[in-house]
């Protein structure tokens, strides 16, 4: 599973960067993200970045153990492969921004947010999901269903969930790149409000 996720994620990165280049867009991070990161590759233009792969993959086992649960293998690969900036894409007309850590500090913050998310779901007696991407509607998030491995659009704090793909690799393969400077949230035609 890890290899499939990493391969699909690498393909998303490659397609996204090619899409930006075809449109003459220089991939840069916003000014508030000018924090140190191994994603930076150009000393003369520190705002430029590209995804960076860890020499050895990390995982989320420490927080899964602390939460006394087992995380779906796909989430370890998704967040443990390395670092990246904001990747904007479309899934069947729904504009999404993939959540990716920018550096080690961001990876630690991400883990804290995942712990808080899981604890909130437990308090509400909802099945565990692990967020993957944001959408324009802040009350919804794209997540991995920890039990089934399906990718779902969920209403935060509610039981409302719509299955988008049967697996994380399938979801990633169906993403279409959006221009970095023109992320226009779209309303998905085939999902209920």
Curated annotation (Swiss-Prot):
Coiled coil: none annotated. It is a peripheral membrane protein. Pfam families: Syd. One of its GO terms (cellular component) is cytoplasmic side of plasma membrane. Keywords: Cell inner membrane, Cell membrane, Membrane. It is found in: Cell inner membrane. Belongs to the Syd family. Interacts with the SecY protein in vivo. May bind preferentially to an uncomplexed state of SecY, thus functioning either as a chelating agent for excess SecY in the cell or as a regulatory factor that negatively controls the translocase function. This is Protein Syd. It comes from Tolumonas auensis (strain DSM 9187 / NBRC 110442 / TA 4).
